[in-house]
Structures are given as structure tokens and as C-alpha cells.
From Swiss-Prot:
The keyword Nucleotide-binding does not apply. This is Probable capsid protein. A zinc finger (CCHC-type) spans 418-435. It comes from Carnation etched ring virus. A motif (Nuclear localization signal) lies at residues 120-123. Interacts (via nuclear localization signal) with host importin alpha. Belongs to the caulimoviridae capsid protein family.
Amino acid sequence: MNREAILWKNINSIPEEPDLIKSLEVLSMEQNDRERELEHNLILNKQISEQIPEWIIPDSLSELSSGIDLNFVLEEQEVNDNNSQPSLEEEVVSESDVESMRSFNVAMNRGEVGESSNKRPKREPDLFTSFGKIREDIGDKNPSLNILNLDCVNSPSDRKNKIDKWAAELGLVFLTNPEAYTTAPNAARARLAYMEHKSLGIVNRFIKSTQWTQMNGDILLNVVSGLYTMFLGEDYTGNQEKTLEQERAKASLRLINLQLCDICSLQSFFCDYESNLYKLPQNEYPSLVKQYLAKIPIVGEKASKRFEEEASAATSYSLGFAHKLVNEELAKICELSKKQKKLKRFNKNCCSTFEKPYEYGCKPSYSKKKKYSKKYKPKYTKYKVIRKKKKFSPGKYFKPKDKKSEKAKYCPKGKKTCRCWVCNIEGHYANECPNRQTSEKFKLIQIAENYGLEPIENPYEDQQEICLLEQIQLSSSDSELDDTCEESSSEESE
């Protein structure tokens, strides 16, 4: 029987003592570490053999155990553990030691100790540069990655990924150890104990507080279904087909909408396309692979032709084969571009040394380059360049009125504001005056009309008008009127 199966079979008979808890910790180790610990740890084998009669000590340790007193080894280990613990007694420091330490610190701050240079010391070369790179490739450094802990994990997708990864790992452990987890009488108890050991926080409390042994079916499937219900709010058995259909619909839509515009982003595009391709059924792979080649710019057409010629019945389903053809065509284009760059730097004068001549003793004909005369154009012009208008815009033929200038006097239509010459009242003209028949001034106007004169529309200032009217009013005879008319005519000519 397997050594691990014996441990799980008698796990309930092992008392919970600090020395024997080591046996339970060994079961939670990785397979290589677990085998190494069970094969080379003599003390652990002795302790297990005292509790489990079926336990067999390996041959490599049986000879060694006969010549070594186990009690002496245990006592020596306890002494070493006690010596490794720090003592609680504090060392008494004298005042002279304190003064010496203080002076040393002051000297260090002033730079008096050691070299006086303020430069930072050079870093020593790393002699093991590749050690870190090698260690990165050796498994997971964190041993708690395979332990399920959903405390403060808020994202439902993260919770689902953690539960699925945990369930897949446990299923592999149970499948590879059937003697302990499948065919053993207490296989269900062993599985449950292993799941409790591989969980923390709220998941561990949920597993311990539920009566899983009273349920029918596989205990691992029941636990995973319970985790889906409690921490994701989903039915694990009922929603699997529904969620699978939704994922397929999203993947199909994304494959249609994906585009590649820059050929330098080919690897990211391929990764996204590949991750969604394998969510769909296999009978759709050939058409989706051709669709991938059609989305590739520059080299997609050549790669698709090669795919139709070279693809077999098996490789027609392979997206990796199509991606390989695309990379090969890209490599050809890159090599051609490198050659073109080299040809630009190639000196053509050396071609005559490699070619056989057709003429001997003839003068070489040099082709002259045709010269083109170009009219000199000064950089700066003295005159302003007048640009033609592209569209018609009417010019401005009127300028705004000057607010300071006096307004021209005229009688607008409607209400008249000019003053009458007969009655000297605003609101009407002299020919419309109601007092024109009785007024003496109207008679003077009639006399002026008889001499061929007519009234004008205020061409003079107010003072000149008043003076002219006064002269007309004061004249009582025709001779005086003639004199005033001659004076007014002379003023107009002036």
C-alpha cells in the first residue's frame, strides 16, 4: 500500500500533538517535497511508526536508525532550539562604552573615519547574474497559491477563477491517489480533510460548518456547487450550459469585430483571437482560421494563398499553422527592406570593375545633366502684394455722420417743424399760413413774387435769416425793397 494512503487511512487515529502535526503538514506539501521528507526524515518516520503499526521505515533509514539513539537526537534538537531563542537578559553597557560609541558616530558623520572621499562606493559586480533568471522558472515561489481564500475578493470573475483553479487541482490530487481518496474506507473523510486543509477564511468555515457526508454524490462536486451558490450566487450544475452559451456568443461576436491596423501589433491581435477561438466548437475552426488570415494587412493575401495550397486536413483546423505562415511572409518582407536600404548605399562607380567592357580605346561619353534656369526671386519684396478677391463684396460709398456737426434744417413729411415766415410760428409753411390774407408780411411776399423772387429753404444761418426778414419788414416802399434785394443778391454771389 502507498505510504500516503496509510497516513490518510489512519489519520483519525493520530493524536493532535505538536510533534505529530508535522505528519499532517507533510501531506500538504508538493509531491517532490513530500517524498523527500518521508524518505529522509528519520525522526518523522519513528514518530509515525509508534502510532501506526503498518508504517514501514525506508531501507535507507532502517540501518541508520539501528545505530543512533533517537532519544539522544531529540534531546540535542531541543537544546539547539533553546539556544537559538534570544535571551531576555539585557547586556549592561558601561558609560565608557557609551562615550566611545558616541565619539565614533561623530567621527563617522564628519568623515574622519576611513577614507575621506565623499563619493559613494562602487557596487561590486554581480557574479551570479543568471541565478535570478533560473529561479524564476522553477515553479511558484508562493506556496499559498493552491489554497483557496476568498476574503475581500470583490470581483465575481476573480472568485470564479480561484474556485475553478482550486477544484481542478484537488481533482488531480484525488485522481492520482486513488488508494487514499477513492478506494479507502474513509475516502470521503480524507477528501474533506484535504479540502479543509487547502482553504482559508470564510471558505474554510463554510466547509467545516456544512454536513457534506450526509449528501449523495461526489463530495468534491458537492463542495464546489456549494461554493458557487454561496460566494457567486450561481447554480453550478444548472448554469454551466447557460454560461457556456453566453461565452460562445461573446467570443463569436468578438472574433468578427477584431481588426488589425498596425502589423506591429500582430502578437497581441493573435493572442486575443486565439483565446476567443478555442471557446467555440471545433467544426467552426477552418472558417475562423481563414477569417484570421483575411484580417492581416500586407501579408494576409499571400499567407492565405499558401494556406490553401499547403494546409492538410489536420492543419486546416490549426490557427498556429496560419500564424506561422504569416510570420514567414513578414520575415521575407523585412529581409527585402533590408536589402533595399543596402542598395541605396551602394556605390555604382564600382560596377565597371565587375562588368566586361564592350569598347576598347574609346573615349568615355559623359552624359551631362540638363540645366534648368530659374528666374531669381528675391526673398523680400518692396511692394505690397495685392491679392485678388475670390468673392464679390460691395464697397462702402457712405461714411457715418459726424455727431458734432449740426444737423441740416429741413421740414420732414408729416408734422412740420419749420417756422412760418408770415406769422413766425412753427408747424406750417408760409404758403399754408392761415393769416396770409390779413398779414402785412404776406403782402411783402406778393411784392417779391412780382419781382420774380421766390422763397428758399433756409440756406443761411438763423441770424442772417432774421436780418433779411427785418430788412423786408422795415421796407415800406418799392425802392427800399429793390435795394434789399440787390444787397441779398450780392451776398449770394459772394
